[in-house]
Amino acid sequence: MPDTAEFQREDIETWSQPEGKSFDEWMNSRVARFETRTYDWDALKFQADFDPKYARAQCRYMGTGGTGVESDENVVPSEHFTFSTMVLPAGCEGPSHIHVDVEEVFFMLKGSIRLTIEDDNNAYETILKDRDLVSVPPGFYRGLLNVGQEEALML
């Protein structure tokens, strides 16, 4: 099969077949199965230690960004991309914060959250429910609150 890419896969470490791994082993390392995932309640524990209302867990599938976790051998390696689920217990919230270098996307799998997006002059608030998605550009503060009676689960 001809390589139609305008770049070389070898230029990006996580896109290159590791030395000593067969093609099948390499491709298997790029599959993240739900049964091998665990919820990491410690990734954002420093916030929950400040106030229990900030308790939430991350279940990583690809990459380790977004929460300051620097390494996780149980994820699909990635360059500049993170894919995880977040569990937000009823009544808990993600405090207002900003990412200046990345867009952040939330996709609601179940539950409902109140999402607030702000800059210096504006504020926006909405309720996200099952299968809703929002994209927050870099440079905006965002915060969320589980307004439902059950845990919220989002990508």
Annotate the PLM regions.
Residues L145-G148:
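Asparagine-centered strand-capping/turn motif at beta-strand->loop junctions
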Residues A90, D101-R114, E118-D119:
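Glycine- and acidic-residue-biased ligand/ion/polar-headgroup-sensing regions
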Residues D119-P138:
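Short acidic-glycine-tyrosine-enriched beta hairpin
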